[in-house]
C-alpha cells in the first residue's frame, strides 16, 4: 500500500502527463497546455499571475516547453502559497 506522500507524488506525475500528452510528449507541457493546467488544476493561484507569466518564469532552459523538473518549481511555489493560506485561517 502506498503512503500518503507516495500517492501525492504519483498524482503530481499523473497531472503532468495529463497535460504533456496532449501534444504527445511525455517530457514537455507547452504554453497553451500550461494555461489549461493552471486554469483547471489550480485556478485559485491564477489570481496573481497569468499563464504567460508563469510560463516565462518556469521555462528555465527556454526550450519552449515545461519539463517535469520545471513543473516541480510550479508545485513548490503553489505549495508554499497554499501553506501560507492555510496558516492565515
UniProtKB/Swiss-Prot annotation:
Subcellular location: Secreted; Cytoplasm; Cytoplasm, Cytoskeleton; Cell membrane
Keyword list, A-Z: Antimicrobial, Antioxidant, Apoptosis, Autophagy, Calcium, Cell membrane, Chemotaxis, Cytoplasm, Cytoskeleton, Immunity, Inflammatory response, Innate immunity, Membrane, Metal-binding, Repeat, S-nitrosylation, Secreted, Zinc
One Gene Ontology cellular component: intermediate filament cytoskeleton
PROSITE patterns to which the protein is assigned, alphabetical: EF_HAND_2, S100_CABP
Membrane topology: Peripheral membrane protein
Secretion signal span: none
Residue sites binding Ca(2+) 2 per the record: 59, 61, 63, 70
One Gene Ontology MF term: calcium ion binding
Stored SMART domains: EFh, S_100
Main location class: secreted
Residues annotated for Ca(2+) 1 binding in this entry: 33
InterPro entries cross-referenced by the UniProt entry: EF-hand-dom_pair (IPR011992), EF_hand_dom (IPR002048), S100/CaBP7/8-like_CS (IPR001751), S100_Ca-bd_sub (IPR013787)
Organism superkingdom: Eukaryota
Tissue: Found essentially in phagocytic cells.
Gene Ontology biological-process entries: apoptotic process; astrocyte development; autophagy; endothelial cell migration; innate immune response; leukocyte migration involved in inflammatory response; neutrophil aggregation; neutrophil chemotaxis
Subunit structure: Homodimer. Preferentially exists as a heterodimer or heterotetramer with S100A9 known as calprotectin (S100A8/A9). S100A8 interacts with AGER, ATP2A2 and with the heterodimeric complex formed by TLR4 and LY96. Calprotectin (S100A8/9) interacts with CEACAM3 and tubulin filaments in a calcium-dependent manner. Heterotetrameric calprotectin (S100A8/A9) interacts with ANXA6 and associates with tubulin filaments in activated monocytes. S100A8 and calprotectin (S100A8/9) interact with NCF2/P67PHOX, RAC1 and RAC2. Calprotectin (S100A8/9) interacts with CYBA and CYBB.
Job description of the protein: S100A8 is a calcium- and zinc-binding protein which plays a prominent role in the regulation of inflammatory processes and immune response. It can induce neutrophil chemotaxis and adhesion. Predominantly found as calprotectin (S100A8/A9) which has a wide plethora of intra- and extracellular functions. The intracellular functions include: facilitating leukocyte arachidonic acid trafficking and metabolism, modulation of the tubulin-dependent cytoskeleton during migration of phagocytes and activation of the neutrophilic NADPH-oxidase.
Additional comment: Binds two calcium ions per molecule with an affinity similar to that of the S100 proteins.
Name this polypeptide is given: Protein S100-A8
Species annotation: Bos taurus (Bovine)
Lineage of the organism: Eukaryota, Metazoa, Chordata, Craniata, Vertebrata
Gene name of the record: S100A8
Amino acid at each position: 500500500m502506498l503512503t500518503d506522500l507516495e500517492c501525492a507524488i504519483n498524482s503530481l506525475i499523473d497531472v503532468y502527463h495529463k497535460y504533456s500528452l496532449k501534444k504527445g510528449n511525455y517530457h514537455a507541457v507547452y504554453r497553451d497546455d500550461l494555461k489549461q493546467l493552471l486554469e483547471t488544476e489550480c485556478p485559485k493561484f491564477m489570481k496573481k499571475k497569468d499563464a504567460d507569466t508563469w510560463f516565462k518564469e518556469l521555462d528555465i532552459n527556454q526550450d519552449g516547453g515545461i519539463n517535469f523538473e520545471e513543473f516541480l518549481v510550479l508545485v513548490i511555489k503553489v505549495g508554499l502559497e497554499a501553506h501560507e493560506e492555510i496558516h492565515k485561517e
